[in-house]
Design a protein with these regions (language model features):
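Helix-coil boundary/capping segments in enzymes
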Residues: 1-247
């Protein structure tokens, strides 16, 4: 079986760190729908059991949505897991890039050798059922300045946004070729938008033209909660076609 590194996993101990999005009350509203089925502790042993049929030789933990003040605590907890269990092998931690103290936050995260990058979810959409926040942070000069500090600390950026935000992000990402960017969840096309599929195609084309941008084939359920292999395959083919097998 082909060995591979799982590029996007989440672990959590709800008794150790609070995750508001994993706490009741639960609702079908919002971009994630009801998360009640996964609102339980999920550790390395659970992950190994779920992945037993695959030859996983490493796994990258991506920030799991803890409160901002718990971001460093999450990294410290993951370090403990990695030291004992051998997983995760790398971390993409959280830092709010619009925080006035972001330079210190990035330095604190980068002090942990397993931290390779940062994710700050920036999905914004005019539809309140889709948006992750009240404003589009990607157009905020303070957020853009925080983004520019990632290279100073040797960190990549996991980009989770919607296709409508992609064209506006291109100039910023282009100005910083020393910050590797990894598009999360295939760029999260919003198929219910009037021109959602074409918005995604255009956005992915614009970002993929930058050689320091890669994409994860993940998060199919964000695109369609009732996704199937047959239904998602055309989108996977487009993503691979845009970025190539090496990205």
């Amino acid at each position: 079986m082909i060995p591979f590194v799982d590029a996007h996993i989440h672990l959590w101990d709800l008794n150790h760190i609070r995750y508001d999005w994993l706490s009741p009350p639960f609702s079908d509203d919002g971009p994630n729908g009801s998360v009640e089925p996964i609102a339980r502790n999920y550790g390395v042993a659970d992950y190994r059991e779920d992945l037993a049929r695959w030859n996983v030789i490493g796994a990258v933990h991506v920030d799991a949505g803890a409160a901002a003040e718990s971001a460093l605590r999450e990294t410290q907890w993951l370090d403990t897991l990695a030291a004992v269990d051998g997983l995760p092998t790398g971390f993409v931690a959280f830092a709010a890039l619009n925080d006035p103290d972001v330079d210190a936050l990035l330095a604190a995260q980068a002090a942990h050798p397993r931290v390779k990058g940062i994710r700050h979810i920036v999905n914004w959409h005019a539809d309140p059922q889709r948006t992750y926040g009240p404003v589009d942070l990607t157009v905020d000069p303070q957020w853009q300045a925080g983004y520019g500090l990632l290279a100073k600390h040797g960190l990549s950026f996991d980009l989770q946004c919607y296709p409508g935000q992609m064209p506006g992000l291109v100039p910023l990402i282009e100005r910083h070729p020393d910050i590797p960017v990894i598009i999360n969840h295939m760029g999260m096309p919003v198929l219910t938008d009037p021109d959602g599929l074409n918005d995604w195609r255009r956005g992915m084309k614009a970002l993929a033209a930058l050689p320091h941008v890669a994409v994860k084939l993940s998060g199919m359920g964000f695109i369609r909660r009732d996704w199937t292999m047959a239904g998602i395959a055309p989108l996977v083919h487009v993503a691979i076609g845009r970025c190539g097998g090496d990205r």
